[in-house]
């Protein structure tokens, strides 16, 4: 399988638990996970933030006043995808615990999910789109050696 090129910027906001998340998110892992979800070459910034920054961005850009797991800001989809993926560390950590997943596994899934959004995939437009996106996410996660993220 030929993987597309990725220009990655990986950023960690300053917060108390940042070292834990930095240890899980090596540049090589993040690059591998994102590249498996790319259908085109890409320039992507991944930023790991605390709850305060996550909530502020979600409120400002989606008018939802809470921190969410991943926000995708896509600027261009072709010929090169350009996007920022913002992941809220406390939310990711809580969800991983609630779903009995490792932190690494949940980050991998959310990075795949956000990368698909950066290329125009959308699960909020219709049930069919949601099913197609979930099926593709599952296929990618299995290729990466992880379990089906939607398995009950």
UniProtKB/Swiss-Prot annotation:
Protein family (similarity comment): Belongs to the endoribonuclease YbeY family.
Binding site for Zn(2+): 113, 117, 123
InterPro entries: MetalPrtase_cat_dom_sf_prd (IPR023091), YbeY (IPR002036), YbeY_CS (IPR020549)
Main EC class the enzyme belongs to: hydrolase
Cofactor note: Binds 1 zinc ion.
One Gene Ontology term, aspect cellular component: cytoplasm
GO molecular function terms noted in the UniProt entry: metalloendopeptidase activity; RNA endonuclease activity; zinc ion binding
Subcellular location: Cytoplasm
Organism this protein belongs to: Delftia acidovorans (strain DSM 14801 / SPH-1)
Record keywords, A-Z: Cytoplasm, Endonuclease, Hydrolase, Metal-binding, Nuclease, Ribosome biogenesis, rRNA processing, Zinc
The protein's Enzyme Commission number: 3.1.-.-
Biological role: Single strand-specific metallo-endoribonuclease involved in late-stage 70S ribosome quality control and in maturation of the 3' terminus of the 16S rRNA.
Alphabetized HAMAP family for the sequence: Endoribonucl_YbeY
Name of the protein this chain belongs to: Endoribonuclease YbeY
């Amino acid at each position: 399988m030929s993987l597309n090129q990725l220009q990655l910027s990986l950023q960690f906001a300053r917060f108390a638990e940042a070292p834990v998340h930095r240890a899980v998110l090596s540049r090589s892992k993040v690059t591998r996970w994102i590249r498996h979800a790319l259908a085109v070459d890409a320039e992507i910034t991944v930023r790991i933030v605390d709850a305060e920054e996550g909530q502020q961005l979600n409120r400002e850009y989606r008018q939802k006043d809470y921190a969410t797991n991943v926000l995708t800001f896509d600027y261009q989809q072709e010929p090169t995808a350009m996007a920022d993926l913002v992941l809220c560390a406390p939310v990711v950590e809580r969800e991983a615990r609630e779903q009995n997943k490792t932190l690494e596994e949940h980050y991998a899934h959310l990075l795949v999910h956000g990368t698909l959004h950066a290329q125009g995939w959308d699960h909020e437009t219709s049930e069919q789109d949601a099913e197609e996106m979930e099926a593709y996410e599952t296929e990618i996660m299995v290729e990466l050696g992880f379990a089906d993220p939607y398995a009950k």
